[in-house]
C-alpha cells in the first residue's frame, strides 16, 4: 500500500484503466494515510471520505461495464483547497466567519473535477481568505511542513502542498493570488502552476483579489500537474473574466519536454530576482539549475525588468483595495457567522461584532489598508499609482519576451522558515512573495518545480519558470526537461 500512495498520478491512472488497481482501493489508501498522518501535518480541514469513495466506486463500476472513462485522471483522488465551493463539504476559507458554511453550489472547477471522475478527498487548510504566506493565518491552526515539522509549508495554500509531500494525495488544487500555489510548492518539493489569468474559471472561487486570483494544479511531477491542468482549464460563461480561447496542449508539452532537449529555447534570468536578501543555499541551487538548463541546450541570458523593484509595493496596495471591497459581503446578514443577533443590537452593531469576532488580524489589517488606499483624497496617490506601476511591470515582461521564451528565478528568497518567525512581522511575511507576485500583476503564467535541497539546511528549493499569457505549454516543456535532468529527489517522509 505504501508503494501505491507514493506512485505518481499518471502511473496510478494507467493502473486504474488497466484494472491493476481499483479507484476505490487507491482512494481508501489515501484516506488511510490522511488518518494516520494528518494529526502531525494538519493539511486538511474537512475530510469527505464517503463522497470520495462513492466517486471512486463510480469509476470502478464504469470500468467493469466496459465504459469509456471520463478523463485520463479518472479514479485518481485529489485534495481541494478550501477556497473552492463544494455542496457536499463545508467551505470555510480558513476563516471563523465561514465556520461550518456549506455552499448551495459547486465551483466550476469542482464540477470539472467531478465530471472527470476525480474523487475529492477533502478540503485543505489555508491562510484565512488566502491572505498569508505560511498557512499560519488559518483560524483552525497552522499546517506543518512534512520536511520539517517546525517549519511552515508556505501559503496561502500550504495544506494542498503538504498533502502532496506527505503522500496523502497524488493531486491537489490551489489558488494563486501572489504566489499561493508556487511558493508552497517550492517549500515542499512539489510542483505548482499558476495558469494564465482567465483560463481556469473563478466561478465558485471565494474572492480575495479578483484581478489577481487564479486557481491552478499541484502535483508531485510536471506531467501529473499538466494532466490536472488540462482537466480544469477552459472557458466558463459564468466567469466574466474567463477567456474564450484555445488552451495550449500542456500535456503534450510535458511529454515532449521529458526528452530533455531544450535546444532553441531562449531562457532569461531576471536580474531583479536574485542577489541581496536571498539565502545563499537558494542562490546556489538556482545557479545549478540554470547551468543544467544550459547543458540541455537552452540559450540563457540575463533580462532586466526594472519595475519589478516596485512590484511588492504596488501589489500590497492593489490586493488590499480589492480585499476591502470583496469582503464587504460578509455582513452577518446573509450567511456565515452572526454575533449579537438577539434583538438588542442594531444591524450595524451586529455587523461590527460579527466581523470583529470572525475575521483574523491579517484580514483586518488588509481591509484597513485597502479602505485607506481607496479613500477620497488618497485614491490617486496610492491605488491609482499602484495600477500605473502594474502596467509598467506588464510592459517589462512583454519586452522581455521579445528576446526570450521563458524567464527563470528562484521561487522564494529562502527555504521554509520556522513557524512563528514572521507571523508578527507583516513586512517580513510580505517580502516572502517577492519572486512570485509580479506574474499575478501581469496575468501571466508560472511554475515552481523542485530544484533540489539547499546546502544550508537541507530543505527544498524551487525553480520558478515564467511564460507569457497563453504560453502555459512553455512552462511544461522547460519544467519537464529540467525535472528529467535533475533526477529523483529524496522524499519528505
Curated annotation (Swiss-Prot):
Catalytic activity, as annotated: L-glutamyl-tRNA(Gln) + L-glutamine + ATP + H2O = L-glutaminyl-tRNA(Gln) + L-glutamate + ADP + phosphate + H(+)
GO cellular component terms listed in the entry, alphabetical order: glutamyl-tRNA(Gln) amidotransferase complex
Active site: 81 (charge relay system), 156 (charge relay system), 180 (acyl-ester intermediate)
GO biological process: translation
EC number: 6.3.5.7
GO molecular function: ATP binding; glutaminyl-tRNA synthase (glutamine-hydrolyzing) activity
Keywords: ATP-binding, Ligase, Nucleotide-binding, Protein biosynthesis
Cited InterPro entries: Amidase, Amidase_CS, Amidase_dom, AS_sf, GatA
Root EC class: ligase
Similarity comment text for this entry: Belongs to the amidase family. GatA subfamily.
Job description of the protein: Allows the formation of correctly charged Gln-tRNA(Gln) through the transamidation of misacylated Glu-tRNA(Gln) in organisms which lack glutaminyl-tRNA synthetase. The reaction takes place in the presence of glutamine and ATP through an activated gamma-phospho-Glu-tRNA(Gln).
Name of the protein in question: Glutamyl-tRNA(Gln) amidotransferase subunit A
Organism lineage string: Bacteria, Bacillati, Actinomycetota, Actinomycetes, Mycobacteriales
